[in-house]
């Protein structure tokens, strides 16, 4: 019974405790702050939030933070017992690439429940602040010096050289934004009017992280009075043999010029590069509007060039800087290619051109190839433009000689560079499918006719041997045992062959019949002997037959 009462008493105390705390706080429960926002600009970390109950006064707010891998919460320095709805915790040394969590609560004698902010990574949430801008005026140009808004920024320590800047400039009198340019941290805006006020604003961007900053405050400056000597214009660089030729235009004669160069990558680095410009050998104090210097003056790379004019008393401002790429300005060599011939097409494989020492030339800019081909017996040319290095030339005739030549062009129209044509290479296409079919048919016919040809040849040889090389006759001693004479040559005119005749005599009347028959045969043979060429043979035969008749009569008697 005591246990039951004790349990009931405990339940009552637990239920009453919140009521007691609420009464101690003035009879109201504190609510957690809402809509907490984290704003990070460069290295400045700002927290903002809203009160849940404006009617409750003298309420303070405190923040805790927690890093990844931590179990406990740590008080956020600079954001403890804050009476306003904003606090700055920039003094906290955080790893800007490490994820953190924040939580906030309201406090007045008692405390509200914690309100947790979604975890975030400072670098991803940070924005690029407005850069600092310093201006210098010339008569037709403005020199701009840009530096980060926060010096030695921790947030952008690894990306200081990756910033790009964009500029918006306009005449102050018009108020219309005229030009938008991408610029370096040290830049010069050309083609302005003298004694004119221009206003501009600049913002930074970090393209590698897809971050766009906010614009700087507007800065205005007035250009100076026009200088007596204008700067040189229209600067161009060309290649002749193993030298660079630098040319420019100028209004006045009897002037002296000098040319300077600077590594282009230095423009991306913050700082003053005024004293890093260097003179080009053979281009100092020249009296003409051009200068020539050897290619070995510059190693492979990108440079900036500028020219200045002087008459001995006055000096012009520096000309507009031009970009000079040794790879692009170098002489563009013709391509090297190999041809694989088919029956109705060529496969052309294009390779890098070769320089002295048979080493390939490495080209860091994209090229397109112009291929011209024609029949060796004709002057009608056809042209193909290809970006690929594996090109097929279709619709060719079988067993025909075609010639091919090629040259390279830069794809960038601003460069407008082309090589000379390569030497022409001539190749003969292979036989077509029709020729192969006829060849196969011819072989089959020849194989089929071969036995007949062999047989006909054998027969012909036998005839030749039989006519011109007959077999020898047997001797007279052997020949008398054979009554049948050998076959005569059918192709030559010969006497009639002798035929052995046999008679069967049954009675005397038969003998008379035989005699009559013999007489008839004799008359017929005599008639035939008049038309025969060999009459001697028939007379021999008659004698033989008459003898035979007499012998038969004697045998019968």
Swiss-Prot record:
Compositionally biased tracts (Polar residues): 528-539
Signal sequence bounds: 1-27
Disulphide-bonded residues: 79-87, 199-220, 283-291, 403-426
UniProt key word Phosphoprotein: yes
Mutation effect (residue 424 to T): No effect on activation of STAT1 upon IFNA2 or IFNG binding
Keywords attached to this entry: Cell membrane, Disease variant, Disulfide bond, Endosome, Glycoprotein, Isopeptide bond, Lipoprotein, Lysosome, Membrane, Palmitate, Phosphoprotein, Receptor, Repeat, Signal, Transmembrane, Transmembrane helix, Ubl conjugation
Effect seen on changing residue 307 to I: No effect on activation of STAT1 upon IFNA2 or IFNG binding
Segments for region (Disordered): 516-557
Tissue distribution: IFN receptors are present in all tissues and even on the surface of most IFN-resistant cells. Isoform 1, isoform 2 and isoform 3 are expressed in the IFN-alpha sensitive myeloma cell line U266B1. Isoform 2 and isoform 3 are expressed in the IFN-alpha resistant myeloma cell line U266R. Isoform 1 is not expressed in IFN-alpha resistant myeloma cell line U266R.
Residues where Phosphotyrosine is found: 466, 481
Residue ranges that the UniProt entry lists as topological domain Extracellular: 28-436
Effect seen on changing residue 80 to H: No effect on activation of STAT1 upon IFNA2 or IFNG binding IFNG binding
Residues annotated as domain Fibronectin type-III: 32-126, 127-227, 231-329, 331-432
Carbohydrate attachment residues: 50, 58, 81, 88, 110, 172, 254, 313-314, 376, 416, 433
Consequence when changing residue 24 to V: No effect on activation of STAT1 upon IFNA2 or IFNG binding
Keyword Transmembrane attributed: yes
Annotated consequence of substituting residue 386 to L: No effect on activation of STAT1 upon IFNA2 or IFNG binding; requires 2 nucleotide substitutions
Reported effect, residue 169 to M: No effect on activation of STAT1 upon IFNA2 or IFNG binding
An annotated GO cellular component: receptor complex
A GO molecular function held by the record: type I interferon receptor activity
Pathology linked to this chain's protein: Immunodeficiency 106, susceptibility to viral infections: An autosomal recessive immunologic disorder characterized by increased susceptibility to viral infections beginning in infancy or early childhood. IMD106 affected individuals may demonstrate adverse reactions to vaccination with live attenuated viral vaccines, most notably measles, mumps and rubella (MMR) and yellow fever vaccines. A subset of IMD106 patients develop severe reactions, including excessive hyperinflammatory response, encephalopathy, acute respiratory distress syndrome, and multiorgan failure.
Record's function text: Together with IFNAR2, forms the heterodimeric receptor for type I interferons (including interferons alpha, beta, epsilon, omega and kappa). Type I interferon binding activates the JAK-STAT signaling cascade, resulting in transcriptional activation or repression of interferon-regulated genes that encode the effectors of the interferon response. Mechanistically, type I interferon-binding brings the IFNAR1 and IFNAR2 subunits into close proximity with one another, driving their associated Janus kinases (JAKs) (TYK2 bound to IFNAR1 and JAK1 bound to IFNAR2) to cross-phosphorylate one another.
UniProt protein name: Interferon alpha/beta receptor 1
Organism of provenance: Homo sapiens
């Amino acid at each position: 019974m005591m246990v039951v009462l004790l349990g009931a008493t405990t339940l009552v105390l637990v239920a009453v405790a919140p009521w007691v705390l609420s009464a101690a706080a003035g009879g109201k429960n504190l609510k957690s702050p809402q809509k907490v926002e984290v704003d990070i600009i460069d290295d400045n970390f700002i927290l903002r939030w809203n009160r849940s109950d404006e009617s409750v006064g003298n309420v303070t707010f405190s923040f805790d933070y927690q890093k990844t891998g931590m179990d406990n919460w740590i008080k956020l320095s600079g954001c403890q017992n804050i009476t306003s709805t904003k606090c700055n915790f920039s003094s906290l040394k955080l790893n800007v690439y490490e994820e953190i969590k924040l939580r906030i609560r309201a406090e007045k004698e008692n405390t509200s429940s914690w309100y947790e902010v979604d975890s975030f990574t400072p670098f991803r949430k940070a924005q690029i602040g407005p850069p600092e801008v310093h201006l210098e005026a010339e008569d037709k140009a403005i020199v701009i010096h840009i530096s980060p808004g926060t010096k030695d920024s921790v947030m952008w320590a690894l990306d200081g050289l990756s910033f790009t800047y964009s500029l918006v400039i306009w005449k102050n009198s018009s108020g219309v934004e005229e030009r938008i340019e991408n610029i370096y941290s040290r830049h010069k805006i050309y083609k302005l009017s003298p004694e004119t006020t221009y206003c501009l604003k600049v913002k930074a961007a970090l393209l590698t992280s897809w971050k766009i900053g906010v614009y700087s405050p507007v800065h205005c400056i007035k250009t100076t009075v026009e200088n007596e000597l204008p700067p040189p214009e229209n600067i161009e660089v060309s290649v002749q043999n193993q030298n660079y030729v630098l040319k420019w235009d100028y209004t006045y004669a009897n002037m002296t010029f000098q040319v300077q160069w600077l590594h282009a990558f230095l423009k991306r680095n913050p700082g003053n590069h005024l004293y890093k410009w260097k003179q080009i050998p053979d281009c100092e104090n020249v009296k003409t509007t051009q200068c020539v210097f050897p290619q070995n003056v510059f190693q492979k790379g990108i440079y900036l060039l500028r020219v200045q004019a002087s008459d001995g008393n006055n000096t012009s401002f520096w000309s507009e800087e031009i970009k000079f790429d040794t790879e692009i300005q170098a002489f563009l060599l013709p391509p090297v290619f190999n041809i694989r011939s088919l029956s109705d097409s060529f496969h052309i494989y294009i390779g890098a051109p070769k320089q002295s020492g048979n080493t390939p030339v490495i080209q860091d800019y994209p090229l397109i190839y112009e291929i011209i081909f024609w029949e060796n017996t004709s002057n009608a040319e056809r042209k193909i433009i290809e970006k690929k290095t594996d090109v097929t030339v279709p619709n060719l005739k079988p067993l025909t000689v075609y010639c091919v030549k090629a040259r390279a062009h830069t794809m960038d129209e601003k460069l407008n560079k082309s090589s000379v044509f390569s030497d022409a290479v001539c190749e003969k296409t292979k036989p077509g499918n029709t020729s192969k079919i006829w060849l196969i048919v011819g072989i089959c016919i020849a194989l089929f006719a071969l036995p007949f040809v062999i047989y006909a040849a054998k027969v012909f040889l036998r005839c030749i041997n039989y006519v011109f090389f007959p077999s020898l006759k047997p001797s007279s001693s052997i020949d008398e045992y054979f009554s049948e004479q050998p076959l005569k040559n059918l192709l030559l005119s010969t006497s009639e062959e002798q035929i052995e005749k046999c008679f069967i005599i049954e009675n005397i009347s038969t003998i008379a019949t035989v005699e009559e028959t013999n007489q008839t045969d004799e008359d017929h043979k005599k008639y035939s002997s008049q038309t025969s060429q060999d009459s001697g043979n028939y007379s021999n035969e008659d004698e033989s037959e008459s003898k035979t008749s007499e012998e038969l009569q004697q045998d019968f008697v």
